[in-house]
Amino acid sequence: MSKYDDKKQLKCSFCGKSQEQVKRLIAGPGVYICDECIDLCSEIITDEFEENTQVDLSSLPKPSEIKNYLDDYVIGQDSAKKALAVAVYNHYKRINSDVDVDDVELQKSNILLLGPTGSGKTLLAQTLARLLNVPFAMADATTLTEAGYVGEDVENILLKLIQNADYDIEKAERGIIYIDEIDKIARKSENPSITRDVSGEGVQQALLKILEGTVASVPPQGGRKHPHQEFIQINTSNILFICGGAFDGLDKIIEKRTRKSSLGFGSTVQSKEEKDIGELLKESVPEDLLKFGLIPEFIGRLPIMVTLQSLDNSALVRILKEPKNALVKQYKKLLLMDNVELEFEDEALKAIADEAIERKTGARGLRSIIEETMRDIMFDIPSQFNIKKVIINKDTIKNKKPELVLTEDGEDRPEIVQTKHKRKSMDPETA
């Protein structure tokens, strides 16, 4: 302050206090600010920042609204939708809860989705994130390994979330992470092994702290950590983790536990096909997951178990035509862009569903079946202008030959037009 005139009384430009009344006065171009005003401004900014980082409960959909939204995109699985809706709603209420009021701290409840392949586990998680307008990241558990081994570190899961939040850490800390194929990191045997299981139990151990809530150090460019790089610090306490897996073989563990064996007259003989896999999974308990290969600590950090049912023929047919982004609607739109109408007969939809069940791919296999059926005709349509309608019937699913409705002008005119068009655009002498 020596460069200023001592005789001139300096005052804070905001509160008007003189330099004798405050501890420190900071000078700017023609203005001054005291330490008290700096502290006050800092408190205002901090309060506003904390308000912005909270999820507005008034705008947060109620559980019934969440389920109704899921109904638009996911067919069936009503019990799973209800469980997810309640869990997600409670999770974001927990984020906004004030521990200082009554000293009651709400613990985080991550979700474990169990269901056969193609039952809608991934779609449910994606649809939830879209509704809530929060950052969402998907990860594949099969690529994860314990730190120090070839593969991805578990922290790379958090990096995907940070990237999807445009590197807004506070926004990412309220996001949702879906870890698929979580059953693939089960340890190889029920009993602990003396050999190191770097892609099974080792990954489960590495995920424990992140699932529970910790301040994780994430490499900004991904990959392996090394001591000379800077890290992004992110608190996972308010990140909702949804883990999903098909858990092939878990049904046999449940069946073995629940099967009642009796001898002599009056014994009940149960066939293996008596219960659907989805029905068996509903009876799963933590003990079954332990025998499957998940460690107790990992099971404890996924307290909410949601079971999805296998999809039958009627459910798959509804999936084909009812959702807002149904496959039938998608392919109709694709052909309409070439001015061609597409019609799926009901028997064709049932045949597609039957083939998906036979392949044991669930809803995930529906697109590949339609793609195989439509491939040749979608190849021909842009070149053959006489096709105005394509009809997919039951026989089409078997022989891959759709029924075509042609224009009344005949087949020769489009070929002539097409030939002239090709010559004009491809002949180097006329170009």
From Swiss-Prot:
Record-listed Zn(2+) binding positions: C12, C15, C34, C37
Positions bound to ATP: P116, T117, G118, S119, G120, K121, T122, L123
Domain ClpX-type ZB: 1-53
GO biological process, one term: cell division
Region described as Disordered: spans on this chain: 408-431
Alphabetical keyword list: ATP-binding, Chaperone, Metal-binding, Nucleotide-binding, Zinc
GO cellular component, one term: HslUV protease complex
An annotated Gene Ontology molecular function: ATP binding
General function of this protein: ATP-dependent specificity component of the Clp protease. It directs the protease to specific substrates. Can perform chaperone functions in the absence of ClpP.
Assembly: Component of the ClpX-ClpP complex. Forms a hexameric ring that, in the presence of ATP, binds to fourteen ClpP subunits assembled into a disk-like structure with a central cavity, resembling the structure of eukaryotic proteasomes.
Family classification: Belongs to the ClpX chaperone family.
Protein name: ATP-dependent Clp protease ATP-binding subunit ClpX
Organism annotation: Clostridium novyi (strain NT)
